Amino acid sequence: MRDLLSGFVAGLRSLAPSRFPYRRFALALLLGGIGGWLFVQARLPLPWMLGSMVVCTAAALLRLPVAAPSVIRPPMTMVIGVMLGAGFKPDIVAQLPNWLPTLAGLVLFMIACAIACVGYFRRFGGFDPVTAFFAGMPGGLIEMVTVGEEKGGDARIIALIHSARILLVVMTLPFIVQWIGGVPLGGARASGPSIATTPLFAELTLLACGLAGIVLAHWLRMPAKFLLGPMVVSAAVHMLGWSDSVPPFEIVNAAQLILGVTIGCRFVGTTPRLILRILALSLGSTVILLALTLGFAYLVARVSVHGPVPLILAYSPGGLAEMSLIALALHMEVAFVAAHHIIRVFLVMISAGPLFGLLIGRKKPGADPQDETAGGEGKGESER
């Protein structure tokens, strides 16, 4: 508990005017808001997330003075966790047996993605074995960067590849879902009650779920504690029938805006040349991943009670929060989508290290003749 309080105090200190780039963050929010508004006017899917993401990525590419410091993410991540937990309903336990075929398909899907993407980055990216392995694994960004750096990989390349993957998947998947499922994602009014009409007790209940979830996750040493902890507590409260409150649509829009801004600003501080190269490489890997996603979704749909569209969202190689927000916008079973992404990240997290040791062993990345292409180019770039 002391560590949690220390982290909270450190977070408050980082908000001091001398340490927090308020002007650059305000510009990022302004540009993100303009992007979201433009996407709303164009009736495009998930406008506040995609619009802010596209504009902030362009701003980073143009080297505009934008920034989204990491300290702003935990509070919004907590909100998203509570929001996702609210999608778990009391009847969810009865549906768990129906998830067995889809979870089995998920394991095979992950293996296929890892083999295809690691090989792709080795052959076309010229990455050293360590960097290619952790850039190609379909796991969470933070986990893959942390373990990859420990094993001797280029942490910045791994981070940029996973950031670009999430960027490209989130930008393209809503349109794919709209095209395949005929589901209208854009132009509709946001669902959920307004914050002005939501009872104060309901809002306090959701806030309590978030705070209690952070404490629980810290105590249990859960990964992604600001997301998973609040989601677990909120899910328990909603599954037990103690609350049926859902977040106001203004909070949902704000979550989309902040997510889009933070994803776009991940490329700040990296040269345009490296950004374009990473985006080009990630475009190829994203095509591979989405092709595998569609293929496995349609195959598994034949042996399960779930249709292709929810399976596409459950298997898609995007982030947990981003894919769950898309499911929320589609009025689909958020619990189904979120659970599959949690299991995917968990399985990759516990298996990546041992699998790396089994396949690559103690081989040094510097011994590979292709190292100069990927790691060498990144070494001279400015740090993010």
Functional labels for PLM-detected ranges:
Residues 124-164, 306-340:
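Alpha-helical membrane segments and immediately flanking helix-loop junctions
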Residues 3-72, 76-92, 197-271, 291-298, ...:
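Structural signature of multi-pass alpha-helical membrane transport proteins
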Residues 65-68, 86-99, 115-130, 298, ...:
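Transmembrane alpha-helix boundary signature
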Residues 69-80, 101-102, 126-137, 159-162, ...:
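Cytoplasmic-side transmembrane-helix entry/capping segments in multi-pass membrane proteins
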Residues 90-98, 179-197, 241-247, 273, ...:
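Membrane-interface helix termini and inter-helical loops of multi-pass transporters
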Residues 138-144, 158-181, 292, 320-322, ...:
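Membrane-embedded alpha-helical segments of transport systems
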Residues 289-384:
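C-terminal transmembrane helix pair
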Residues 1-30, 154-157, 182-200, 358-384:
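Intrinsically disordered, low-complexity non-transmembrane regions of multi-pass membrane transporters
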